Amino acid sequence: IRNSSYQTIKGLELKKFIDQLDYLKKNYNIISIEEITNSLMHKTKLQKRSCLLTFDDGYKDHHKYVMPELMKRNISGCFFPSAENIINNNVTETNKIHFILDQQKNSDLIIKDINNFLISKNFKIPNKKKIYENFEKKFIKRYDSKKIKYIKFLLQSWIPDPLKGDCCTFLFDKYLKVNEKEFSKKLYLSPKEIQEMINNGMTIGGHGYRHLRLGDLSYKNQLKEINLMLNFLKKFNIKKKWIMCYPYGSFNNNTKKILNKKDCLFAFSATP
């Protein structure tokens, strides 16, 4: 990150990752997904201080840097790529927001551009105070500044689909001035790299198709999102005993019903 063109992206330098890995290896019992599966199926206890390594979003760095370090230590990890950006070589809305904020430090200008975009689409902007009240409740635990939280709330939650995707693309094109497909190929894993990771003992799970907040979707739209994700996993012969990590940690009872019907072993969330 330090030597890249995007130096304010929130990521971890390789040296710090190696230090963290060595700390975990020394102080915890790093386990595999098979050990968790056996524990759940046979109702046996895991060893004390057990630790499972998981990596979301399917970044190319996971193949280039993470996998080799895990293999050096004879440990495995679980990787959860989102499907659409790998299939269609686009950039997820979440990552577009990260790079927009990296390239344009003036939050007021971003907010102005968002408002102008919405106006151009004849989308009425409600009272700003009401928006602030809503996002404060939802994003209160974020460490970003108030304006950054506001921007993320607008682009991730408040603006409806498909308008929010169009808005993210508009801002991404304006501030980064790059070819999205080529940018995506450099950012995310390729199918070949995913297969190499599987061949080297890594576990691949589902992370949605478009990386949407499942808990905000209707049953019908969740089912569509999960079916598309499963079609992606089948390309790697992942058909049974599959696992999932919820994008944003978001899910509801409908999500759990669908996963049960689809024979999902279990799913991970960022929230209890």
Report the location of each language-model feature:
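Catalytic alpha-helical scaffold of carbohydrate-active enzymes acting on polysaccharides/glycoconjugates
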Residues: 1-243, 248-272
